[in-house]
Amino acid sequence: MAKRGNKKKQEAPLSLGKHTVGGRVGKPTNAKTGSALTSDKSLFDKRIVKQLKNNELFNRLTLPSQELRDGIVRENQTKPSNSNSQSNGAISIRGIAGPTNVVIENLAPGTSSDDVAATLLNFGEILNCQVNDSQGKVRASVRFSTLASAQQVVQKLDGVTADGFKLSCYIKKNSKKRRTQKK
């Protein structure tokens, strides 16, 4: 006789456009607990990968960067990278360590903050995710714990077509002005 308390919960499916992918939504955890995905190779079964092999957003999220550079995924547009080094060899250190906001514009109507967070979970720790729908324009603001995670999202998702809409992604500059005390 099976015990009722030991049944595993059925995980909610994740949708990428008209395709549905099974998986857990949330932060990855220890493999011993079995409460989250354990490796990149086990994220999707072969049937799902075969169905989504021509989906540009899925490919950008799952293919290694080298394959993207080699042209397996066709780039919609080429933009200069937001690197921290300038042409004269100088680097920028300010702003590297803190949390960074990414704005994703032109999302499909009906997209929720949970949808966005689940899609971007592979890029890094998400501190906050909000979706605003203003007059039919859906826009997400996602706060990542590191600048590197935010830059990776912009690099992979800017210009990608998702759910029939071409996404626009950029890093939001911090507009807070710091006050200096005069003595």
Curated annotation (Swiss-Prot):
<keyword id="KW-0694">RNA-binding</keyword>
<dbReference type="InterPro" id="IPR012677">
    <property type="entry name" value="Nucleotide-bd_a/b_plait_sf"/>
</dbReference>
<keyword id="KW-0539">Nucleus</keyword>
<protein>
    <recommendedName>
        <fullName>Uncharacterized RNA-binding protein C126.11c</fullName>
    </recommendedName>
</protein>
<dbReference type="InterPro" id="IPR035979">
    <property type="entry name" value="RBD_domain_sf"/>
</dbReference>
<dbReference type="GO" id="GO:0005634">
    <property type="term" value="C:nucleus"/>
</dbReference>
<feature type="domain" description="RRM">
    <location>
        <begin position="100"/>
        <end position="174"/>
    </location>
</feature>
<dbReference type="GO" id="GO:0003729">
    <property type="term" value="F:mRNA binding"/>
</dbReference>
<feature type="region of interest" description="Disordered">
    <location>
        <begin position="1"/>
        <end position="36"/>
    </location>
</feature>
<dbReference type="GO" id="GO:0005730">
    <property type="term" value="C:nucleolus"/>
</dbReference>
<dbReference type="Pfam" id="PF00076">
    <property type="entry name" value="RRM_1"/>
</dbReference>
<dbReference type="InterPro" id="IPR000504">
    <property type="entry name" value="RRM_dom"/>
</dbReference>
